[in-house]
């Protein structure tokens, strides 16, 4: 079974709604780890809409599992990553007008730039994952620029409106896993996963980690964060 990385961005979203000091995403990360999360994910966006620089620095000091820093492939973010030294970095696309990340990186179209960033980070001992759609050309390009990981974008699977459409998207994810592993890549997945749709993705052969945030934080509002994390662990095992 894959491990669970808990994305704490939306704890920071609530805090930033009032520009105050609570709830603190650092405290949320501690509680998530105590409840069984094997990793903590935070996305430091260029517009700083939720996670702040202060959060990333404190997370690096406090996270005892693995810290996954999601970021755009910009010079500013590379400098921050080289300074903070997360356990690994996930490169994601960003548009200021988007509500959340809308799709995977276009590795094919940005190959030279992404190859440079991957080399900068991995030469410094920071493994890099690329957040991509489960498309053969994007997977091949990710392997070609020597990223260690990919994170398959599960948004289309999560948003499928019929069982047939969901089955089709799950098959694409399965094929993506197989292709990536054959190319020497390690595979994570995330985006839009919930307690009700996570189990089939968790069962994909070779899947190593699922990064999940919004549904856990939404559940935590009602039942508390520790219970919400424990329930997600059960859901990943098909036991919820």
Swiss-Prot record:
<feature type="binding site">
    <location>
        <position position="18"/>
    </location>
    <ligand>
        <name>3-amino-2-oxopropyl phosphate</name>
    </ligand>
</feature>
<feature type="binding site">
    <location>
        <position position="192"/>
    </location>
    <ligand>
        <name>3-amino-2-oxopropyl phosphate</name>
    </ligand>
</feature>
<comment type="pathway">
    <text>Cofactor biosynthesis; pyridoxine 5'-phosphate biosynthesis; pyridoxine 5'-phosphate from D-erythrose 4-phosphate: step 5/5.</text>
</comment>
<feature type="active site" description="Proton donor">
    <location>
        <position position="191"/>
    </location>
</feature>
<dbReference type="InterPro" id="IPR036130">
    <property type="entry name" value="Pyridoxine-5'_phos_synth"/>
</dbReference>
<keyword id="KW-0664">Pyridoxine biosynthesis</keyword>
<dbReference type="InterPro" id="IPR013785">
    <property type="entry name" value="Aldolase_TIM"/>
</dbReference>
<comment type="function">
    <text>Catalyzes the complicated ring closure reaction between the two acyclic compounds 1-deoxy-D-xylulose-5-phosphate (DXP) and 3-amino-2-oxopropyl phosphate (1-amino-acetone-3-phosphate or AAP) to form pyridoxine 5'-phosphate (PNP) and inorganic phosphate.</text>
</comment>
<feature type="binding site">
    <location>
        <position position="50"/>
    </location>
    <ligand>
        <name>1-deoxy-D-xylulose 5-phosphate</name>
    </ligand>
</feature>
<feature type="binding site">
    <location>
        <position position="7"/>
    </location>
    <ligand>
        <name>3-amino-2-oxopropyl phosphate</name>
    </ligand>
</feature>
<feature type="binding site">
    <location>
        <begin position="213"/>
        <end position="214"/>
    </location>
    <ligand>
        <name>3-amino-2-oxopropyl phosphate</name>
    </ligand>
</feature>
<feature type="site" description="Transition state stabilizer">
    <location>
        <position position="151"/>
    </location>
</feature>
<feature type="binding site">
    <location>
        <position position="45"/>
    </location>
    <ligand>
        <name>1-deoxy-D-xylulose 5-phosphate</name>
    </ligand>
</feature>
<dbReference type="Pfam" id="PF03740">
    <property type="entry name" value="PdxJ"/>
</dbReference>
<comment type="similarity">
    <text>Belongs to the PNP synthase family.</text>
</comment>
<dbReference type="InterPro" id="IPR004569">
    <property type="entry name" value="PyrdxlP_synth_PdxJ"/>
</dbReference>
<keyword id="KW-0963">Cytoplasm</keyword>
<protein>
    <recommendedName>
        <fullName>Pyridoxine 5'-phosphate synthase</fullName>
        <ecNumber>2.6.99.2</ecNumber>
    </recommendedName>
</protein>
<feature type="active site" description="Proton acceptor">
    <location>
        <position position="43"/>
    </location>
</feature>
<comment type="subunit">
    <text>Homooctamer; tetramer of dimers.</text>
</comment>
<feature type="binding site">
    <location>
        <begin position="9"/>
        <end position="10"/>
    </location>
    <ligand>
        <name>1-deoxy-D-xylulose 5-phosphate</name>
    </ligand>
</feature>
<dbReference type="GO" id="GO:0008615">
    <property type="term" value="P:pyridoxine biosynthetic process"/>
</dbReference>
<feature type="binding site">
    <location>
        <position position="100"/>
    </location>
    <ligand>
        <name>1-deoxy-D-xylulose 5-phosphate</name>
    </ligand>
</feature>
<keyword id="KW-0808">Transferase</keyword>
<feature type="active site" description="Proton acceptor">
    <location>
        <position position="70"/>
    </location>
</feature>
<dbReference type="GO" id="GO:0033856">
    <property type="term" value="F:pyridoxine 5'-phosphate synthase activity"/>
</dbReference>
<dbReference type="GO" id="GO:0005829">
    <property type="term" value="C:cytosol"/>
</dbReference>
């Amino acid at each position: 079974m894959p491990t669970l990385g808990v994305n704490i961005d939306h704890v920071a979203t609530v805090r930033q709604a009032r520009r105050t000091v609570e709830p603190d995403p650092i405290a949320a990360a501690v509680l998530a780890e105590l409840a069984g999360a094997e990793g903590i994910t935070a996305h430091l966006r260029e517009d700083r809409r939720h996670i702040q620089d202060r959060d990333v620095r404190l997370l690096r000091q406090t996270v005892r599992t693995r810290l996954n820093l999601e970021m755009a492939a910009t010079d500013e973010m590379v400098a921050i990553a080289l300074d903070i030294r997360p356990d690994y970095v996930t490169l994601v696309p960003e548009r200021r007008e988007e509500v959340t990340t809308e799709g995977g990186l276009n590795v094919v179209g940005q190959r030279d730039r992404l190859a440079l960033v991957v080399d900068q980070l991995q030469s410094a001992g920071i493994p890099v994952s690329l957040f991509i759609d489960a498309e053969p050309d994007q997977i091949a390009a990710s392997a070609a620029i020597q990223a260690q990981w990919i994170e398959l974008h599960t948004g289309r699977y999560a948003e499928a409106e019929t069982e047939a459409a969901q089955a089709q998207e799950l098959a694409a994810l399965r094929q993506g896993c197989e292709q990536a592993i054959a190319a020497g890549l390690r595979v994570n997945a995330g985006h839009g996963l919930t307690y009700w749709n996570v189990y089939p993705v968790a069962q994909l052969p070779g899947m190593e980690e699922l990064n999940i945030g919004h549904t856990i934080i939404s559940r935590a509002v009602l039942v508390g964060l520790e219970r919400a994390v424990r329930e997600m662990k059960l859901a990943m095992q098909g036991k919820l």
